[in-house]
């Protein structure tokens, strides 16, 4: 009887530990330049203008078997906006757009993750230009596995569309430029 009890306890402990090991915390790898927060907006309806934020930090919890337990948290230095054009970047930092002197950071914190086939909808609160609104990011796992340095990584891509006026950006760029698309590529290192 004692052997059966010990065996049951060992099996139960192993299953409990295995279940816990599924969820893992990751730090976004910005130091290795394996993560990007980019955006694009139509320029007069004729072409796309691309930009990015060069300075951000974040983390996520990833459990492939239980996406509802996943979490994402990111902080962006809005002063790091970069469209490869100094005068435009200066204008984007002004009160017409990001107002970085008043709002030096933008943040995203997830509130819910729902699996949707081979992708997921990550809903959370985005604070941009001092305004907080719910946003849903359409995300997809690119891959995961061991890296050559003894670590473990997971990579995702995602996108979301934001209406500028929803975040208090009143500068009118014309009817074709009322929305901005966020384009995300994130690789995290398991902690």
UniProtKB/Swiss-Prot annotation:
It is found in: Periplasm. This is UPF0312 protein PA0423. SMART domains: YceI. Keywords: Periplasm, Signal. Residues 1-23 form the signal peptide. Belongs to the UPF0312 family. Type 1 subfamily. It holds the Pfam family YceI. InterPro entries: Lipid/polyisoprenoid-bd_YceI (IPR007372), TTHA0802/YceI-like_sf (IPR036761), UPF0312/YceI (IPR023480). The keyword Signal applies. NCBIfam families: PRK03757.1. Its main location: periplasm. GO terms for cellular component: extracellular space; periplasmic space.
């Amino acid at each position: 009887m004692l052997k059966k009890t010990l065996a049951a306890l060992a099996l139960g402990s192993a299953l409990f530990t295995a279940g816990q090991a599924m969820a893992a915390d990751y730090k976004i790898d910005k130091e290795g330049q394996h993560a990007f927060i980019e955006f694009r907006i139509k320029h007069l309806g004729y072409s796309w203008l691309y930009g990015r934020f060069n300075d951000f930090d974040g983390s996520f919890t990833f459990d492939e078997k239980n996406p509802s337990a996943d979490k994402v948290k990111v902080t962006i230095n809005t002063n790091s906006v970069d469209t490869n054009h100094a005068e435009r970047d200066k204008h984007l930092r002004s009160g017409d757009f990001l107002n970085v002197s008043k709002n030096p950071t933008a943040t995203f914190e997830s509130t819910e993750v729902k699996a949707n086939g081979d992708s997921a909808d990550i809903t959370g609160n985005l604070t941009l230009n001092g305004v907080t609104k719910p946003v849903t990011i359409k995300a997809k796992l690119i891959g995961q596995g061991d890296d050559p340095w003894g670590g473990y990584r997971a990579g995702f891509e995602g996108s979301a569309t934001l209406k500028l006026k929803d975040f208090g950006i009143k500068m009118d760029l014309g009817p074709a430029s009322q929305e901005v698309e966020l384009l995300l590529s994130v690789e995290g290192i398991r902690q």
